[in-house]
A protein has these predicted regions:
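Conserved GTP-binding G-domain of TRAFAC-class P-loop NTPases and closely related GTPase folds
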Residues: 1-9, 13, 24, 80, ...
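Generic beta-sheet signal
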Residues: 3-5, 57-61, 85
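Conserved substrate/cofactor phosphate-moiety recognition/catalytic segment
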Residues: 13-69
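Conserved beta-strand scaffold positions in the cores of enzyme catalytic domains, especially
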Residues: 27-29, 85-87, 133-136
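Alpha-helical elements of Rossmann-like donor-binding domains used by nucleotide-donor carbohydrate transfer enzymes
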Residues: 47-48, 73, 117, 121
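Residue-level signal for alpha-helix termini/capping positions
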Residues: 50-54, 79, 127
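Mid-chain, well-packed structural core segment of small domains
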Residues: 67-100
Length: 150
């Protein structure tokens, strides 16, 4: 059974690094960062998700996904294709995200206003939102991650 993993958290919260370390060998990486200047980015992402699921492939959606407005359409596509849906919540740490963001290249750095806008909309997901499984992800203090169910 295919799986759709939805990463939820601020920019520079470790989501892409977590993907590379945890899912890169088994899941398709789907991120709007791959097509930053494209028109209709949401529609394109949903189309790519649909195509991957039709091929029986599991997918990680690596965006901020701060609210049901972003994750509900993803969950609906997953359900239509019989896929499980897992959410990985990266609790907000604005100061830590700002520090990591400042170390990014100019090309990938997000303006602080972008972090604040996402923080304002960011909501912790729940099972009532349609997720089959939910996990909380944090840093382990040694360059890795700690993942806890719930």
């Amino acid at each position: 059974m295919a799986e759709v993993v939805i990463l939820i958290g601020l920019q520079a919260s470790g989501k892409s690094t977590f993907f590379r370390r945890t899912f890169a060998g088994t899941h398709v990486h789907l991120s709007k960062d791959h097509f930053p200047n494209a028109k209709r980015r949401q529609e394109r992402q949903l189309r790519m998700l649909t195509e991957a699921l039709e091929e029986g492939r599991s997918v990680v959606v690596d965006n901020t996904n701060p609210s049901p407005e972003e994750w509900t359409p993803l969950i609906e596509v997953a359900r239509r294709h019989g896929a499980r849906v897992s959410g990985y919540w990266f609790p907000p740490d604005l100061e830590g995200s700002q520090e990591r963001n400042a170390r990014r290249s100019a090309k990938t750095r997000v303006p602080d206003v972008g972090l604040y806008a996402t923080l304002k909309r960011l909501r912790r997901p729940s099972a009532e939102d349609g997720f089959d499984e939910l996990y909380t992800v944090g840093f382990d203090g040694e360059g890795g991650f700690v993942v806890e169910r719930g």
